[in-house]
């Protein structure tokens, strides 16, 4: 397919980094590209974001294109791939939410949550019966410090810990 003179000038100016020409190209093709993305994604805002991202990606490699057909093919392929990646990501996210919801609705979750709360309540009530030093040792141990670290921090013998 032969390019007309306008297309040849457009391609050369884009290739040379002329931002005014990019703006013209953007205004001419943005709605078309968003419409194409919208055939893959339901959210028009997401589609606009995808197209904006592809324009940025194009600008980084603009020197690689010698004709308008190649530029448009790049846009369509990049938009398609970006949309498909978004869909895959959304599917993974949805699967995680579904699995998480199933767990939250399960009896296991209820049992674990109740047990944790009860155990925490019992421990909290029992800690108040410890001496101040014993409380410090316990808190440091719960903070995953070693006996040596606890002894050094509190200035006591390791055997006391």
Where are these regions (language model features)?
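Helix-turn-helix DNA-binding module
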Residues: 125-128, 132-133, 143-161
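A short pre-motif secondary-structure segment
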Residues: 137-138
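Short, small-hydrophobic-rich alpha-helical interface motif
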Residues: 14, 33, 37, 47-58, ...
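N-terminal module of bacterial RNA polymerase sigma factors
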Residues: 1-32, 39
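Sigma70-family region 2
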Residues: 15-16, 42, 53-71, 91
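Arg/Lys-rich amphipathic alpha helix in sigma70-family domain 2
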Residues: 66, 77-97
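Short amphipathic alpha-helical boundary/capping segments
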Residues: 9-13, 121-130
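Internal acidic/polar
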Residues: 4, 85, 93-120
């Amino acid at each position: 397919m032969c390019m007309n003179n306008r297309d040849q000038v457009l391609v050369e100016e884009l290739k040379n980094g002329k931002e005014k020409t990019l703006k013209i190209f953007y205004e001419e093709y943005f709605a078309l590209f968003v419409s194409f993305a919208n055939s893959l994604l339901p959210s028009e805002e997401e589609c606009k974001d995808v197209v904006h991202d592809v324009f940025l990606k194009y600008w980084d490699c603009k020197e690689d294109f010698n004709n308008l057909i190649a530029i448009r093919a790049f846009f369509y392929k990049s938009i398609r791939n970006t949309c498909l990646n978004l869909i895959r990501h959304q599917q993974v996210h949805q699967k995680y939410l579904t699995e998480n919801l199933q767990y939250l609705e399960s009896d296991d979750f209820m049992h674990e949550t109740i047990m944790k709360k009860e155990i925490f309540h019992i421990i909290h009530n029992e800690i108040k019966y410890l001496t101040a030093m014993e409380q410090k040792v316990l808190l440091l141990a719960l903070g995953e410090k070693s006996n040596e670290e606890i002894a050094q921090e509190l200035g006591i013998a390791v055997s006391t810990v």
